[in-house]
Amino acid sequence: MERTVSGLQYEDTQPGQGETAKAGDQVSVHYTGWLQQNGIRGAKFDSSKDRGTPFSFGLGAGQVIRGWDEGVQGMRVGGTRVLVIPAALGYGARGAGGVIPPNATLQFEVELLAVAASGRP
């Protein structure tokens, strides 16, 4: 796995061949999220795949946790990336809704489905 200066770890498990996601783009993804403990994938807490509905957001716009804003940038459409997100780039000391405990490390598998560049519908 690659590690960024912020502490995010990522690995492209399936490189994409399409357009590259950049800050300011609107992106559509499928994802599954797990808690991670001691470097091991734990309990699944959310999955757009299970719901059958992709998730769309503005990349780099602060609409998602920082680990996603950083980790999805540079992906190419059709690609799948595993992100290991430290608490500081996730939900921090507050956790989230009783589902994600405080100071949790998160692991996501993210598949980039589409990119709409800023200024383009």
Region roles according to the model:
Residues 1-121:
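Cross-family detector of peptidyl-prolyl cis-trans isomerase
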